[in-house]
Amino acid sequence: MAVHQGNAGLPAQAQTIPLRAWSVLAASTLAFMVCFVVWMMFGVLGVQLRADLGLNSTEFGLLTSTSVLTGALMRLPLGTWTDRFGGRIVMTVLLVVCAVPVYVVSYATQLWQFLVIGLFLGCVGASFAVGTPYVARFFPPQRRGLAMGVFGAGTSGAAVNLFVTPLLLNAYGWRVVPRIYAIALLVTAVIFWLASAPDPGAGKRGGSLLDSFKVLRDPRVWRLCQYYSIAFGGFTALSLWIPQYLKNEYGMSLVMASAFAAGFSLPGSVLRALGGALSDRFGAHAVTWWGLWVAWISLFLLSYPATDFVIHTIDGTAALKLSMPVAGFVALTFVLGAVFAFGMASTFKYVADDFPDNMGVVTGIVGLAGGLGGFLLPILFGMLLDFARVRTTCFMLLYGIVWVSLILIYLTEVRRTPVTG
């Protein structure tokens, strides 16, 4: 069933969207949110495991990001399979299969075991590459930005993780948490299957997985990969990193640090729908361009480490201390989370507009780039911290990546004509 049936003579914006489309959107968003809770759980569990296993910052980064790697690598094949078999089937199978490694986490005792299991568990992170093309096919082009923004709000699972996981950990111990989440995946699979509908685009696009790489010849794909590596990669990495940052930098408890960290994750999730609506209204380029500038300013302020100045005056010496208060940190990360949300939504508005016939494949490739960013960044955060011994180096790194994005978008989209004198 296509959304245009019965409305062929109407303008796209005036066409009635079937109730089934909204049901698919709601079911897909729920499934994605639950998957994201599971995908991000090591951001909280890892703090406890770091103490139990005696991990350094680099090992902690590796622990939290291993599952992100698999989620990134699986986005391309799952995006291709979604085009071939349909999002309903692929999402349901993914939820059921991933419940097994999630449950097995509760039996791990050594770092290498967590890493190996995390590789299998991480497949839940590829659910985004399934849901995005699946949902988009039920909506007309003029409403896809909003629809994909609502679906993308499933990343609120990062905030749900920050609220729920610490409470479960304190109440029952960390080994019970993955068992509860495994059951949640199975229950979600049943709900999703009952509330969703057959994919209208299933089976319409053939070709092998190798054929999917042909779209890499288009330079627009590479540009979108770079945008998404900072928007989604930065969001994912900081969602994993900020709880322990707050705990160590400001001496908070894990529950308190996780609650404050939600000030970043929550807007980075729920405002994604607004980012999609703004992309529909003003275009993906405008939202991406101005969002990057806001991120650049926020990261510049967050990058500055606590510093003591000694000033020599005619009356002696005067001390000046500069540091980021908790309120300032929460406010800036709130803004950063919001612009990352806008950036994630605008990137896939680009995808829907520029690649309507290869949406599943391009979604998988761009999602792969974002997931790789989410995998590499926590490890780099840990390496920089172990080397420089300055916690704000994580924001310094992101600041540099945003600079690259701004230069790239200026050269390829803003400066459309040569400068003449």
PLM region descriptions:
Residues 42-43, 219-269:
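Extracytoplasmic gate region of multi-pass secondary transporters
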Residues 73-111:
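Conserved MFS/SLC helix-loop-helix module at the cytosolic interface between two early adjacent transmembrane helices
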Residues 285-347:
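C-terminal transmembrane helical hairpin of 12-TM major facilitator-type secondary transporters
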